[in-house]
A protein has these predicted regions:
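Carbohydrate-active catalytic/glycan-binding domains of CAZyme proteins
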Residues: 4-18, 24-31, 35-550
Length: 550
């Protein structure tokens, strides 16, 4: 196991630095000049028999000491906020630290974001993930608070999977899965015992894993907030053998759960602490994390990376239809999106954008709903990144136009005017300063109400990418297409936000089309230096570019 950082990320790489490497029994943590920079979670302990000799290079190390017991860190307030006022595209401010699966909840005037803290793209803890829930919240979407971890890792056998926040008996709770089978064989965990109980009784049992001898805890558990905001305490109760439990209270007040990873189906209970009975063994399908929400006259279940179902709220449970098969889903490049209602009848979708194997920046978009229940997406006004003074690039453009870009992070806006309703094509090429090696093409086909990200190194339009219905993979945040839900019969606005950073190792491109659909992509190794517009059957007007504010 290696714990460390590139010295170049320090504010002052040269000169003398005080370095502390601490082992807590659960994790190794490296502190440099009093600040935490990296950690990883242990499996096993250092062998004293192999630690008799230390090799230190005096050209780099002037003094070294071993402390037993270990020096204990003391947490102090940071001199500057660690969370920017704008949360969009945020990542934890540490080396190789990312947002993993996101679950959200609105309670008592506060929007909560719980996210699996990810380092190394799921490669921490020797590839077992080492995930746990960190916690952010806001009351106004402008000021964000970073709370203590909701589910810290306290034992070497712990590594957690996704669940959901929910209310039970008036208390804020969060369910999550113990992904212990990534470390131990299933036979050495509590899962066989839990499945046996379920098969014998027809409902799940309730087990306090502190009282179980000889088996490692696995399955579903939950934590309870002691103050309704933060300060979560683990219950140590195992209540179901699934390892990604999505608990929610339905609109009729019933406690339900969608079982994922290791189980499937819809379940119901009177209490979180066991007694869960299966209502439908085959739906949802399990696997990815699933979330239920009701919006007006419609019920929806969104399932992880690629699944979405809906039905009229008045219809029975078996009436859910596959929205993806119909081609009317609203997946837009995010992974494992979670949906939450906020005041004003608004719904937010939060997820992570794939930049690592299992992590990236946090992204929040707002949903829109049509009378037939179809859902689209748009940017959320309150969290659009601030920009500097916009510069008009062109009042009107037909054919082709090229424009240099001086800022690697910017917002591009323009209006599309079709010559004929629902006719025409447009592409915008995002080019590096020199050459076309890492270029990205965003393309819009008005006749098909279809848009895509693609790779184009030619003068023509890139070949068609696949939508989710067609077998495409929007969740990769690379090349993909979206279809339907865009009204191209009249002029409309397009806004594109490009965020390039050294940490990203490239650029994020987030596009909003007519405030009806959004799509987002990550382009590694691309720093945009030039823009190229090409179009047929349309004109583009009021092209403006504004740099993002620091």
């Amino acid at each position: 196991m290696t714990v460390g950082i590139p010295l170049a990320i320090l504010d002052r790489p040269e000169g003398k630095h005080d370095i502390i490497l601490q082992f807590s029994g659960v994790q190794w943590t490296i502190y440099i000049d009093g600040r935490l920079y990296d950690n990883d979670f242990a499996l096993g302990y250092p062998l004293a028999s192999r630690m008799k000799l230390w090799s230190l290079n005096p050209d780099y190390v002037s003094e070294a000491n071993l402390y037993e017991p270990a020096i204990q860190p003391e947490q102090i307030a940071a001199p500057t906020p660690q969370i920017a006022s704008n949360i969009q595209y945020w990542t934890p401010p540490y080396h190789n630290a990312w947002v993993g699966d996101v679950v959200t909840f609105f309670h008592d005037g506060r929007y909560h974001v719980f996210y699996l803290f990810d380092r190394r793209g799921h490669a921490s803890k020797f590839g077992r993930g080492g995930h746990y829930f960190e916690h952010l919240s806001t009351t106004d979407f402008q000021t964000w608070v970073e709370h203590k971890p909701a589910t810290p890792l306290e034992y070497q056998w712990e590594t957690f999977g996704t669940g959901t926040p929910f209310l039970f008996n008036g208390k804020l709770c969060i369910s999550y899965g113990l992904h212990t089978t990534r470390i131990y064989p299933k036979e050495e965990t509590t899962l066989p015992m839990q499945w046996t109980y379920l098969e014998k009784n027809g409902y799940t049992g309730s087990f306090n894993y502190d009282t179980i001898q000889g088996l490692v805890p696995a399955g579903s558990t939950y934590s309870i907030s002691e103050d309704g905001v933060t300060n979560f305490k683990k219950t140590h109760i195992l209540y179901h053998p699934c390892e990604n439990p999505s608990i929610y209270t339905d609109p009729d007040g019933n406690l339900k759960m969608l079982a994922n990873y290791g189980a499937r189906g819809t379940w119901k209970a009177d209490s979180v602490n066991g007694g869960w009975k299966c209502l439908d063994a085959d739906f949802p399908l399990g696997g990815d994390c699933t979330f239920f929400f009701r919006w007006g006259e419609y019920d929806y279940i969104i399932g992880g990376f690629t699944r979405l179902w809906s039905k009229l709220a008045k219809d029975p449970e078996f009436a859910y239809k596959d929205v993806v098969v119909e081609g009317t889903d609203f997946y837009n490049g995010l992974s494992v999106p979670a949906i939450t209602e906020i005041p004003g009848g608004r719904f937010l979708m939060a997820g992570w954008l794939k930049m690592q194997n299992w992590g990236g920046p946090l992204v929040i978009h707002e949903l829109i709903q049509y009378p037939d229940g179809r859902i689209g997406t748009k940017w959320m006004d309150e969290i659009i990144p601030a920009t500097g003074t916009p510069k008009k690039l062109s009042a009107k453009l037909t054919g082709t136009g090229d424009f240099p870009v001086s800022s690697k992070s910017f917002m591009l806006t323009f209006k599309v005017y079709p010559d004929q309703p629902r006719q025409g094509n447009l592409k915008v090429l995002f080019l590096p300063e020199k050459g076309e090696e890492s270029a990205c093409e965003w393309q819009l086909q008005l006749d098909k109400a279809r848009a895509q990200y693609g790779t184009n190194l030619t003068a023509t339009y890139a070949s068609s990418e696949k939508t989710l219905r067609e077998g495409g993979a929007p969740q990769t945040a690379s090349n993909y297409a979206i279809e339907n839900g865009i009204d191209t019969s009249k002029p409309f606005m397009v806004r594109i936000l490009v965020d390039g950073s050294d940490k990203f190792g490239g650029s994020l491109i987030d596009t909003e089309i007519a405030a009806q659909r959004t799509m987002i992509s990550y382009r590694p190794e691309l720093t945009v230096g030039n823009l190229r517009f090409c179009m047929e059957g349309i004109s583009v007007q009021d092209i403006s570019l504004a740099p993002l504010s620091d």
